[in-house]
Structures are given as structure tokens and as C-alpha cells.
């Protein structure tokens, strides 16, 4: 056996062997059900970063453990390959985005292979390939047939740089595009939507079933769905009793305190309600607001601006006339596009009232309410009604119900549940996306492409400018087609789908990747779904994860699958952070190579002190670490061990080169340990243990089964990979502290066999190499997970700490079952007591059974 651990010599060799032996090919589950481990598939940028490494290695460990436990494991990989980055890169380089993407996929696949991931590449999918997006189009038509896909004119978020429409979720809190960073504008366009709001209640209620998801993610989804209970209230226009404005409120108990009704600037009633003398100012305000994004308009920090329309409505509870305003903070597609302003009991309404001198009427009384309102604040807590006529004296909860019921009897109110969730906008005016399989006919309207004509294939080799709407509009040979219904000239839909459409069902295709008749069979989905362990970033909590849940529920209702939730357990791994050097006065980052003294770093240009931070790795911050460089220097197993050991999976990980070196040294220790035992072991076949066991054998055997128990526990429910590796270190220490020469052959075999099998999911190449060095005939990854022997955990004796006046002075071995009196007697009779007490009896003895005895002179 080579005395030197050389990862470069063995890792590629074993990867080749595993591929040739089909080690990672997915077997059909013998019991009808397998274990599905899945990482969120990546966009193929062409370059693997450490965030990728962490995600995929975590999933790989879980997959390998489940295989060793005897499960049929599905562990696939694919590529979320459509989208703006590829199209923009193609425009910049004047290349075809398909060719660009395919090259990147090849490059990233080879990088993933170097990590030793146990991926079944036979199931690989790329969303940009027509044999995949054919089925994305097929599923779109299923949703269309079910009334879940529809087209309407809508105010949309327009990215002026990428020149495409963005979903609300793709606009950040500053009103900027999540991709380009441009300030988002508002435009009216005819767009395709998916009716996700039809599933709002199910999406919210079924979060309670997802006990294997982080509470944080479930809370984020619940808040995004945003269930509100209240009432819709009709306010009659004073000058036209046949016209009413419908307002939704969660606080019907404050209705008597309304001082105005506020409409969205683009509410359909604004033009008819506006008085002639207010038309100019209203139209100017409408034009100004149209340039703002929804987030800019609704930000808590933004001023609340509006104009009076000249109209009034009647409060149905007390008949009081209320002015009708329009304001920037009211959105036409949220609720009813109208709100009632109650300045005394809503902080936003209070700010608006203060700006425009509107009345403030308190109608909720509680301790401190009057003082808060007098001080210019709104009292938003419940209380007892005042100034509310017949409802005075009721508490808020009862008043909500009574006022709503009264309004229902009078015909001006109805109890209502609403949701913050909006329908999913999927139209994109770009080229590199899945074509929407619809043909627009002047006579027949929107006609679905017949399923036998799918896929609608993207034309290749076209000129991309990146500007001016969809490039597909310019492809006349592609656009102009006969109507499938009447045969008359018609045009294809030139919008492409949001890339989240492709990623909302890919986990289903992996279950049946070669099916040419349908996207997946019900039988295949039932064998593998739901995904038992899904791993990905917290940034996908609202977008991808919510859309995937919607897709799954919709497809179940269409009769295509039987599962209602796609992912049983979810692990959201933390970010990988690197050291950054930042000049606080300029905000600029300095590359580590330009920092002469990392202990007291200074700006090489100005000499100013730099602040040292740990931040998410990125090129702009000069703190990225190339996985290939780490593998070249230390090997894939060391990279894996570091990324798993440095922090719990869900926490952020701070990169530290010295800790990488530490993991390499640990693997070297295991190499040397096996090397020292190599001459004593020619096979790993178990041998009969001598009885009774020698003390050294018993001690090591107990350490073996403590490790099996602890590592198995760490990999069971709460995935704690870092503490599992700590247990491997403890077992290694237990073996080396005794020494292989002091162990019987049977216990030595058991120790090394167990160590290598526990190590195999974490450092698969090293474990495989050492397994074969010790005589293993098949792969360690097929050797089975070690079985716990509870009897080995039973101790005849334990180490008892002896303290003198609170200071540890040594340990003695005592019977594990000794009681307090026996422990005190053994401690007093020990050499430690004789030395430190010098023949004097202690004034006090403190006994902690099984742990320590403290003798106080």
C-alpha cells in the first residue's frame, strides 16, 4: 500500500470505475417505493461556484446514505437552461444562445463529475432542449384546457434594460429588476397568466402538512399568500345612487371613522367620477403614477400622495358624505382597487390625512388610544366602539361581525376572504424561453396548438438585438401559420414563458425521463414522488417553491398525478461566504492579492484602513474561491469534507483555507491508520470475537457503536453533517489512541470496516480506495450501512473525575453501576485523594453519579 495519500491518483480512477459499473444508475424500487434526493437544478453559467458545491454535496451525502441503507435511490441532475442570462451572453458575443448553453452544460457537467457526485446522468434533462420543453408546452395546454391559463390586458412591470415583463416577485424592494438592476416601469400589455389564486386557500392550508420544511420558509409562503378576513362594503356615489364603489376592509368595526374613499389612479370609475374642474390635475397625477412600480408606490417609506376627484360617496353606516380621492399607494389589481381611509385607526391613512387635511374621527376606545391619536399616531389595536351609533359599546371582534351582518341585511356589505397572492404572470418578450403554444386567429381567437404538433420549436440562428420586444415577432416564416381550427391565416404567440414554468415540474420528469408519449406516467410518479429530500437556497422560498406546489396541485386536479405536494422534506442550505476587504469611506472592495498585511489591511492606493468582512462570494467583491483550484490542490474528498464540516447545513459558511488544510490532514490520518493495519487484514469478512473481550477491544468496540448510533442519528431527521463528521473524528481518535497492535483482529476489522462505511458518503473516493486496500471485493458504497449493536454500548466501568476543591486532579475507573456511597468510598481510597488531602479527611464531599466526586478539604 502506498504510504502517501494522493487524491489526484485515486479520485479520477474511482470515478471512471463507478461509471463503468453503473454504480449510480437508478434501480426500480423493489417494494414499489424509492428514495428521491434532489438538489435544485442550476442555471448552466458554465462555471461551478462554492454555493453549487455545498448544495450538491449535501444532497449527495443523503443519497449515498440511503443507498447504503438498502433503498433504491433516485438522484438526478438537470439544467434550468432558458432565460435572460444566456440570451444576453449570446447578444454580447454574437453567438447562438443554444450553442452557448450546450457548451456551458458540458463544462459544468465535467466540473460536477470531479466532485464524485453519485448522480444518475442517464436521467439528465435540460429545459432548453425540445424533448423537454415539448412537455412544458403540453402541460401549459393542460392548464389552458382547465381554465387556469388565460390572457388579459394588465399593468405589468417592464424592465427597460432587458426589455421584458417581470413578475412582482422579480422586482426588489427598491423597485429594481432582480436580474438587470434597472428601475422598473409600468406598462399596459396583453399578457398570459396562470390562475394560481384559485389555489390560494389550498396552498396556504397545506403548509401545515409540510412538517419537514423549515418554519421560516412556511412563514414566508404564508405571508406571501396573505389571507385576510373582512368585508366588502358598497359606497354609493352621492351624485349617482346607481353607481357604487366597492371597498374591501379587514376592519369593518372602524367604518364609522372613515373620512374618505381612495381609488387607484387607474380604477375604471376614476374618469367618470372626476369633476370637470379636477380633470387636469387628476390626469396629470395619473400620468405621473403610471411611471412608478408597484413597490415604489406601496413602500412604507414613500410619501402617500393623491388628488381629490371632486366626487363624494355616502358612508352606508351613518350616511356621512366622504370625499373620493385617488392615491399612488392604492393598486388597481389588489383587492378591489379601492380603500376606505380611516386616519384614526390606520397609520398609512393617517399619513395621507395629515398631508391633505382630512378629518380624523376616533371610533375605537382603549387605554392610551385618545392620547396616541392626539399625538398624530393611529390607534390600530382593537378596543370598544364609540361614535358608531347602535354599535357603541361593542368590542372590535363582535363589532366586525355585527356590522358586516347588518350590512348584508341592508345590501351594502358581504363577508369576504381575500388573498394577497396575485395570478402568476408568465409572458416574457424575449427569445430564449419556451414558446407559448397558442395561435391567434382573427376569427377563432386564441387557439391551442394541437398536441400532435408539439413541440413548437424555437427558430435557431436568428439575429438577436436584445431590444424592442420579442425577437420572435421578426421571424415571419415562424410567426405566420394557418389557424388549426379554421385554416385561415393566423399568427403564433410570440411571447415565451417565464423560466419558472420549466422548473415548476422538472422533478416530475426525472421520475420518467425517457417517456415519449407523455411528460410522465402516473405509475412512475407514484413510485418516486413526493421528493423525500429537496435541497436548495432560501431565496427560492416564494418563487420556485410556491410555483412548484401550485403546479403539483393543478396537475393532480387534472388527473395526471396523485400527489398533492411535491417535496416532503426541504433543506435550505446557507450561503458560502468569503473574506472581503472593503474601504468604508469609498465602499470599494480590494482584492486579497493587493492586501499586504491581512492582519491590519490597508487600501494600497490611499493607505486607509480596510474593514474585513465575511460576505457571499462574488466576483465583484474579489472573494470567490474556485472549486477546481481546491480540488487540484487537496482533492474532491477534502473539498467535500470541509464544506460539510465547517458549519451546519442551514447556516452560512465562512471559507477558511486553514480549515481546508485541517480536513486534508484528517483524511491523511485515516490513510495512515489503514496503512498501519494493512499487514494484519487481508479481507473484511467478519471474524468471531474472543470472549470475554480485552479492555482495549471493549473500549474501541464501544466507540464503534457510539459512532454508528450518533452518525445515523445525525443523518436521520435533522440533517447535521458537521456533527456526523465530528463523530468520525472521535472514532478515528479512539482507534489510534489504543493502537492497531493492541486490538484483536476481529475488533480491528470491525473498527476499520465501520469507519470506512461511515466515511463513504462524505469522502467516497478515499473510503473506496481504503476499502479495497483492506480486501473489500465490491464497492464500499454497496457494503451496507453499519448496524448498531446496543449491547456494545453497555459499560462495565466508567471514568470518574476526581476534583479537589473544584479543580480536576485526575480520573479513576469505577463500576458503572456504583451508587453515591460507593463512589465516595472509591474516591477517598484513590491515590489522588491520598496525594492532595495528605491524610486529612475532607470537610465536604460532593458526588455527581457517573461524572465526578469533588473533595473539599
From Swiss-Prot:
Its EC number is 6.1.1.4. CDD domains: Anticodon_Ia_Leu_BEm (cd07958), LeuRS_core (cd00812). GO terms for molecular function: aminoacyl-tRNA deacylase activity; ATP binding; leucine-tRNA ligase activity. This is Leucine--tRNA ligase. ATP binds at residue 619. Belongs to the class-I aminoacyl-tRNA synthetase family. It is an enzyme of class 6 (ligase). Its main location: cytoplasm. It holds the Pfam family tRNA-synt_1. A motif ('KMSKS' region) lies at residues 616-620. It comes from Parasynechococcus marenigrum (strain WH8102). Coiled coil: none annotated.
Amino acid at each position: 500500500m502506498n504510504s502517501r495519500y494522493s487524491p489526484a491518483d485515486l479520485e479520477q480512477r474511482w470515478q471512471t470505475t463507478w461509471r463503468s459499473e453503473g454504480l449510480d444508475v437508478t434501480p426500480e424500487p423493489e417494494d414499489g417505493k424509492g428514495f428521491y434526493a434532489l438538489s435544485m437544478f442550476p442555471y448552466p453559467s458554465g462555471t461551478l461556484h462554492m454555493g453549487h458545491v455545498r448544495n450538491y454535496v449535501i444532497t449527495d451525502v443523503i443519497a449515498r446514505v440511503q443507498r447504503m441503507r438498502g433503498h433504491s435511490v433516485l438522484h438526478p441532475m438537470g439544467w434550468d437552461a432558458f432565460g435572460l442570462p444566456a440570451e444576453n451572453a449570446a447578444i454580447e458575443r454574437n453567438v447562438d444562445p443554444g450553442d452557448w448553453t450546450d457548451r456551458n452544460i458540458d463544462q459544468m457537467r465535467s466540473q460536477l463529475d470531479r466532485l464524485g457526485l453519485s448522480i444518475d446522468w442517464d436521467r439528465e434533462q435540460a429545459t432548453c432542449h425540445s424533448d423537454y420543453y415539448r412537455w412544458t408546452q403540453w402541460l401549459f395546454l393542460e392548464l389552458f384546457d382547465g381554465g387556469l391559463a388565460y390572457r388579459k390586458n394588465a399593468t405589468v412591470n417592464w424592465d427597460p434594460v432587458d426589455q421584458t415583463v417581470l413578475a412582482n416577485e422579480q422586482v426588489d424592494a427598491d423597485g429594481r429588476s432582480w436580474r438587470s438592476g434597472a428601475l422598473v416601469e409600468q406598462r399596459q400589455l396583453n399578457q398570459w397568466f396562470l390562475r394560481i389564486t384559485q389555489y390560494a386557500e389550498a396552498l396556504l392550508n397545506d403548509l401545515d402538512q409540510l412538517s419537514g420544511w423549515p418554519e421560516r420558509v412556511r412563514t414566508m409562503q404564508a405571508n406571501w399568500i396573505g389571507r385576510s378576513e373582512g368585508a366588502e362594503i358598497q359606497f354609493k356615489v352621492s351624485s349617482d345612487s346607481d353607481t357604487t364603489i366597492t371597498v374591501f376592509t379587514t376592519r369593518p368595526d372602524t367604518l364609522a371613522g372613515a373620512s374618505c374613499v381612495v381609488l387607484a389612479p387607474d380604477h375604471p370609475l376614476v374618469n367618470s367620477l372626476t369633476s370637470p374642474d379636477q380633470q387636469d390635475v387628476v390626469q396629470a397625477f395619473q400620468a405621473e403614477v403610471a411611471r412608478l412600480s408597484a413597490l415604489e408606490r406601496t413602500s412604507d417609506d414613500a410619501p402617500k400622495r393623491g388628488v381629490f376627484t371632486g366626487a363624494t360617496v355616502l358612508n352606508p353606516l351613518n350616511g356621512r358624505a366622504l370625499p373620493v380621492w385617488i392615491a399612488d399607494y392604492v393598486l388597481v389589481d389588489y383587492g378591489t382597487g379601492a380603500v376606505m381611509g380611516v386616519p384614526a385607526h390606520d397609520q398609512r391613512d393617517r399619513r395621507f390625512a395629515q398631508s391633505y387635511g382630512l378629518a380624523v374621527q376616533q371610533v375605537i376606545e382603549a387605554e392610551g388610544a385618545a392620547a396616541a391619536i392626539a399625538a398624530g399616531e393611529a390607534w390600530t389595536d382593537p378596543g370598544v366602539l364609540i361614535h358608531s351609533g347602535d354599535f357603541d359599546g361593542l368590542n372590535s371582534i363582535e363589532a366586525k361581525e355585527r356590522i358586516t351582518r347588518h350590512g348584508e341585511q341592508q345590501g351594502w356589505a358581504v363577508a369576504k376572504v381575500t388573498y394577497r397572492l396575485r395570478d402568476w404572470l408568465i409572458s416574457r418578450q424575449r427569445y430564449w424561453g419556451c414558446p407559448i403554444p397558442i395561435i391567434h386567429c382573427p376569427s377563432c381567437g386564441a387557439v391551442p396548438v394541437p398536441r400532435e404538433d408539439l413541440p413548437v420549436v424555437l427558430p435557431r440562428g436568428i439575429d438577436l438585438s436584445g431590444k424592442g420586444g420579442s425577437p420572435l415577432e421578426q421571424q415571419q416564416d415562424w410567426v405566420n401559420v394557418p389557424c388549426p381550427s379554421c385554416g385561415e391565416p393566423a399568427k403564433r404567440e410570440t411571447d415565451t414563458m417565464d423560466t419558472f414554468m420549466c422548473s415548476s415540474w422538472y422533478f416530475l420528469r426525472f421520475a420518467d425521463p425517457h417517456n415519449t408519449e407523455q411528460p410522465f406516467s402516473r405509475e412512475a410518479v407514484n413510485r418516486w414522488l413526493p421528493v423525500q429530500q429537496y435541497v436548495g437556497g432560501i431565496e427560492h422560498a416564494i418563487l420556485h417553491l410556491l410555483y412548484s406546489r401550485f403546479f403539483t396541485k393543478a396537475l393532480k386536479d387534472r388527473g395526471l398525478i396523485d400527489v398533492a405536494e411535491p417535496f416532503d422534506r426541504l433543506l435550505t442550505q446557507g450561503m458560502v461566504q468569503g473574506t472581503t476587504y472593503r474601504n468604508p469611506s469609498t465602499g470599494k472592495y480590494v482584492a486579497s492579492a493587493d492586501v499586504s498585511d491581512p492582519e491590519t489591511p490597508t487600501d494600497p492606493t490611499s493607505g486607509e484602513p480596510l474593514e474585513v468582512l465575511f460576505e457571499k462570494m462574488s466576483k465583484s467583491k474579489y472573494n470567490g474561491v474556485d472549486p477546481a483550484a481546491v480540488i487540484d490542490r487537496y482533492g474532491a474528498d477534502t473539498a467535500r469534507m470541509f464544506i460539510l464540516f465547517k458549519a451546519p447545513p442551514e447556516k452560512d459558511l465562512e471559507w477558511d483555507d486553514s480549515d481546508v488544510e485541517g480536513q486534508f490532514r484528517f483524511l491523511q490520518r485515516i490513510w495512515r491508520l489503514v496503512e498501519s493495519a494493512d499487514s494484519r487484514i487481508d479481507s473484511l469478512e467478519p471474524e468471531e470475537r474472543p470472549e470475554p473481550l480485552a479492555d482495549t477491544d471493549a473500549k474501541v468496540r464501544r466507540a464503534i457503536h457510539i459512532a454508528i448510533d450518533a452518525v445515523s442519528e445525525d443523518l436521520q431527521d435533522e440533517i447535521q453533517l458537521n456533527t456526523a463528521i465530528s463523530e468520525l473524528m472521535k472514532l478515528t481518535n479512539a482507534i489510534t489512541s489504543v493502537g492497531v497492535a493492541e486490538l484483536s483482529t476481529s475488533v480491528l476489522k470491525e473498527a476499520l470496516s465501520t469507519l470506512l462505511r461511515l466515511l463513504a458518503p462524505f469522502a467516497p473516493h478515499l473510503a473506496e480506495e481504503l476499502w479495497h486496500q483492506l480486501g473489500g471485493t465490491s464497492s464500499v458504497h454497496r457494503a451496507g450501512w453499519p448496524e448498531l449493536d446496543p449491547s456494545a454500548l453497555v459499560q462495565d466501568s466508567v471514568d470518574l473525575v476526581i476534583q479537589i476543591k473544584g479543580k480536576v486532579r485526575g480520573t479513576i475507573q469505577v463500576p458503572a453501576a456504583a451508587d453515591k456511597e460507593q463512589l465516595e468510598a472509591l474516591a477517598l481510597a484513590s491515590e489522588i485523594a491520598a496525594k492532595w488531602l495528605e491524610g486529612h479527611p475532607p470537610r465536604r464531599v460532593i458526588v455527581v453519579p457517573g461524572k465526578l466526586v469533588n473533595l473539599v478539604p
